[in-house]
Amino acid sequence: MSLDTTEKQQLINSHQTHATDTGSAEVQVAMLSERISKLSSHLQQNIHDYSSRQGLLKMIGRRKRLLGYVRGKSEQRYSDLISKLGIRG
């Protein structure tokens, strides 16, 4: 459940901190969140796809680590990010 180029560019534009930002933690969390939501909907249809479930758990763990990093840097950036993405934190 990968993202195509236009989806990635929209996510980057909406979460970047400056004009050339493509890899900040906020952008990475946004891309992971989108991939997680797509993979979750796939797994609702394909219940026995265990390898995709493992990938989903890895992505969730990575997003959790990145959110911890953002929270350690700035509590305000963290709260803005989770409210913008609509995830609980």
From Swiss-Prot:
Quaternary structure and interacting proteins, as annotated = Part of the 30S ribosomal subunit. Forms a bridge to the 50S subunit in the 70S ribosome, contacting the 23S rRNA.
Is Ribosomal protein there in the keyword field?
A: yes
This protein's name: Small ribosomal subunit protein uS15
What gene codes for this chain?
A: rpsO
Q: Does the keyword Chaperone apply?
A: no
Query: What's any GO biological process attached to this entry?
Result: translation
Under the heading Pfam families, the entry gives: Ribosomal_S15
> Which family does the record assign?
Belongs to the universal ribosomal protein uS15 family.
- Function, in words: One of the primary rRNA binding proteins, it binds directly to 16S rRNA where it helps nucleate assembly of the platform of the 30S subunit by binding and bridging several RNA helices of the 16S rRNA.
